[in-house]
Amino acid sequence: MSVHQIRKRAVLPPIICRSDKEFLESMQRYIITETERLGYNEEGPADEYYIIYRNVFDKVIEHVTAYKSILTSIKKEYDAFIETIKKGRRTAFCLHGKLKGLAAEPTALVYHRKRTIQLEAKMRIIENNSSKIQSQIDQIKQSRAAYDTKEVKYCTFSKDPSKPIPGMTLQESMNLDALTKYMKHLEDKYAEIKQAMLIKYVPAQRKSDLDEEMIVLLKRRDVAENLNRKLQFCHQRLQIISQALTSWVKSDMSSPFQDFVEQIQKTKYLQGDQGIVEELMEDDPHRAKEAEIMLHYIERFNELISLGEYEKAACYAANSPRRILRNIGTMNTFKAVGKIRGKPLPLLLFFEALFITSHAFRCPVDAALTLEGIKCGLSEKRLDLVINWVTQQRLTFSEEAGDVICDYGEQDTYNKAKCLALAQIIYSECGLHKKAILCLCKQGQTHRVMEYIQQFKDFTTDDLLQLLMSCPQIELIQCLTKELNEKQTSLSFGLAILHLFSIDKKKIGIKLLQEINKGGIDAVESLMINDSFCSTERWQEVANICSQNGFDKLSNDIMSILRSQAAVTEISEEDDAVNLMEHVFW
């Protein structure tokens, strides 16, 4: 049979086995089912269709055996081709977006410029309107001020025409000649008053200038008086030396010159120093007018109070000569004024001026005024002023002042630390070391507490236990019961534990026992050996407390150490008759 004949013979389709046929039908059904489940037609999203056919391709590869490697290679190329298409689409989408952005930039720039022009025009309109409104407001203010001035000028002195004219009867007020004569009298009186104002009176500003000048002159006078006293004292000493030298020269100069000086000095003392001073001061012109000046100063102060010039009055009183107005009476004057709405408290103004000028006087502000000033500042919520007064000015502190600041700190918790620091300064200045150290404890400054205790060594055990009652802190107790620089402890640990449990501070005591329990028996033994204040009976009480609160090991350690100490007997060096081996032979 030729080749041509073979090619002309009809080619039969391959015979498909039953299993392959069922597999192909199942794949066809799977494709139809998944496509319908997506709800899209044939032109739907390519990604979903790609997933469906990829799954079918995988199942076909799993089903066949002879062509599995070929189909796997085809599928790999197919997946790579699909991924390349997706990547190209994403790149095209990004480039399309950038292209649209670049195309829209000129338009956006035009819109922004247009919007800028619109906003600038709107700002100019608003500024013009604002300037018009401001000019209208200024005009209204000017018109109102002019109206008020006119009202004061014309309405204040207006009188009811129906009322009778003072100094004229009803018939005279109806007579034109009498009215003309009375008007002439009033005009003459007005001219006289106006002339008197020009001659007899000066402006109030001139009065204040004179007051300031007088204050400066009074200060200069005080300086001159101090210098004058020093010169008088020097003159008196030179006079004594001169008289002694004259007497010594007239004598035979056998006696020492020092004896003549002492004799002349005793003679002067018998005559009286006050008489010498008065003799030397009798020509002082300021002494005669001192009482008059002080009286004028007090009158001026009262005048300022009556005029309501409380700030000037406060400065005037604070700078008064010889401190005549720096007293409780002046304080009561300001206190009687009370509060004025919209203005500072006059009493606070007085204390401000009083404390600020405290350095200008030899003596500091007394304790009573200091206490009242601190109370006034705290009542007005001016802790800043009180801080400045206490730290910068010359005041006389007292225990009451520190207590007032502490009480204020308890009410104002935000400023409690500042108040405790101020109170500690005051207590330290007054020598109230117990209260000063309590303030340090409340601030949590344990190291400063220990430094304070070492500096002032007059703290007894009762004082320290009282401190623990007021401020039970674990860190403080540990520092007090610890040796510092090989020195004896400030407080007994055992006494501290017993004291805490006796004053219902059980929690603090338990925490201390927990801390000491962590150190083991060596720490307990070291603590007991170095504790010379607590007796054996006291340590037995501590052991009982430990046992009652669940610290059995610590209790046993304490009792063991007590037994070991009881077995040791100290032999003095003087007792030579003691035989250490005596018990062996008996």
From Swiss-Prot:
Pfam families: Clathrin_H_link, TSNAXIP1_N
This protein's UniProt keywords: Coiled coil
InterPro entries: ARM-type_fold, Clathrin_H-chain_linker, CLHC1, TSNAXIP1_N
SS bond list: none
Residue ranges the record marks as coiled coil: 174-232
Protein name: Clathrin heavy chain linker domain-containing protein 1
Organism per entry: Macaca fascicularis (Crab-eating macaque)
Gene: CLHC1
